[in-house]
Amino acid sequence: MAAVRHLCQRTAIRLRLTCSPQSRVCVVRGHRLGPFDDEQYRKTSVSIMQKEASAGTVIYSYSPRGFNINGNTVFGPCAVLPPAILQWNVGSHSDISVESLSLFYLLEPQIEVLVLGTGARTERLHAEVLEELKKRGIAVEVQDTPNACATFNFLSSEKRLAAAALIPPPAGSR
């Protein structure tokens, strides 16, 4: 009984013990004032991507594993749509299609420039992809990923309506 009281005092539980005289079983009823460890995992958490809304999105670095954008690590290919950063489901430049870029068509206000980073080298895109972007009034810059990151940072610093679709360069390509 002393152990139960000690445990309850540590976890800030108020107790009302009811014991029957015929048995050694006690019913413990109480109210918790603080969360237990297992309740911490059920809570929703929010990561603040940037402290100020006007600061803009900046790509600080890239690696074969992903990117450091506004101090946050993003693994794998990503779509940078200020102020959001999303995983982009492509494996290489050959996977870039009209469907894989459909996310960029839905943005309001419409982006002016889409910067595509194709990995270690500048790669050619399928003609229908370029035609679709032109038809929708979106200028496209296809570059190797290091230059695409720099171009996006420049456009972002000028407050242009730009987005980036980036594929990390493979290991050993720097």
Swiss-Prot record:
<dbReference type="InterPro" id="IPR007523">
    <property type="entry name" value="NDUFAF3/AAMDC"/>
</dbReference>
<dbReference type="GO" id="GO:0032981">
    <property type="term" value="P:mitochondrial respiratory chain complex I assembly"/>
</dbReference>
<dbReference type="GO" id="GO:0005634">
    <property type="term" value="C:nucleus"/>
</dbReference>
<keyword id="KW-0472">Membrane</keyword>
<dbReference type="Pfam" id="PF04430">
    <property type="entry name" value="DUF498"/>
</dbReference>
<keyword id="KW-0999">Mitochondrion inner membrane</keyword>
<keyword id="KW-0539">Nucleus</keyword>
<dbReference type="InterPro" id="IPR034095">
    <property type="entry name" value="NDUF3"/>
</dbReference>
<comment type="function">
    <text>Essential factor for the assembly of mitochondrial NADH:ubiquinone oxidoreductase complex (complex I).</text>
</comment>
<comment type="similarity">
    <text>Belongs to the NDUFAF3 family.</text>
</comment>
<protein>
    <recommendedName>
        <fullName>NADH dehydrogenase [ubiquinone] 1 alpha subcomplex assembly factor 3</fullName>
    </recommendedName>
</protein>
<keyword id="KW-0496">Mitochondrion</keyword>
<dbReference type="GO" id="GO:0005743">
    <property type="term" value="C:mitochondrial inner membrane"/>
</dbReference>
<dbReference type="InterPro" id="IPR036748">
    <property type="entry name" value="MTH938-like_sf"/>
</dbReference>
